[in-house]
């Protein structure tokens, strides 16, 4: 039997599910009567998603469709970091939506501090964009998970690598 148990706190998403959500959004834009002639383009890169469209109103409609498709595919809406709306020549607008992946160092420190303050028998260590939590008791680890689920963080948290 292991002397200590641990798990990792990560913030990640399924890339293929995001690709599918963007693809479904594009199909709905082409099929919807109010968006059909807007010449809306979605461009997905590793850095983020760029939306090119005719107006800010259309941009808001596309964002709503994207959020619906992402939610149906079990993607957290917290992965989207909406940038400013920019003019793209003529009356067209564009917006870059950055994709959040990994736990930022400030947030990792905040999570680690919360764990240290509330759970004396649990150790938390920051390893890059992952927080490793370890303890001698599985019950303590489950209490940490329950406590973190009650918090509202700007990134979605997943608990992986149970040992």
Curated annotation (Swiss-Prot):
Transmembrane portions of the chain: none
Protein name: Nucleotide-binding protein tll0793
Keywords, alphabetical: Nucleotide-binding
Gene Ontology molecular-function annotations: nucleotide binding
Residues of the signal peptide: none
The keyword Translocase is annotated on this UniProt entry: no
PANTHER family, sorted: UPF0234 PROTEIN YAJQ (PTHR30476:SF0)
UniProt-listed InterPro entries: DUF520, UPF0234-like_C, UPF0234_N, YajQ-like_sf
Disulfide bond entries: none
Organism of this sequence: Thermosynechococcus vestitus (strain NIES-2133 / IAM M-273 / BP-1)
SUPFAM superfamilies (UniProt xref): YajQ-like
Family the UniProt entry places it in: Belongs to the YajQ family.
Function as written in the Swiss-Prot or TrEMBL entry: Nucleotide-binding protein.
Cited HAMAP family: YajQ
GO cellular component, one term: cytosol
């Amino acid at each position: 039997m292991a002397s200590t148990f641990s798990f990792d706190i990560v913030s990640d998403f399924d890339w293929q599910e995001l690709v599918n959500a963007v693809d479904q959004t594009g199909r709905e834009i082409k099929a919807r009567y109010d968006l059909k002639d807007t010449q809306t383009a979605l461009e997905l890169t590793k850095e983020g998603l760029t939306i090119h469209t005719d107006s800010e109103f259309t941009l808001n409609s596309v964002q709503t469709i994207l959020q619906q498709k992402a939610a149906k595919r079990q993607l957290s809406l917290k992965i989207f970091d909406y940038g400013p709306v920019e003019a793209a020549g003529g009356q067209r607008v564009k917006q870059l939506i950055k994709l959040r992946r990994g736990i930022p160092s400030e947030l990792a420190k905040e999570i680690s501090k919360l764990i240290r303050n509330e759970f004396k028998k649990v150790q938390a260590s920051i390893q890059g964009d992952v927080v490793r939590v370890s303890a001698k008791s599985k019950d303590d680890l489950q209490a940490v998970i329950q406590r973190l689920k009650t918090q509202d963080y700007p990134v979605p948290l997943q608990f992986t690598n149970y040992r």
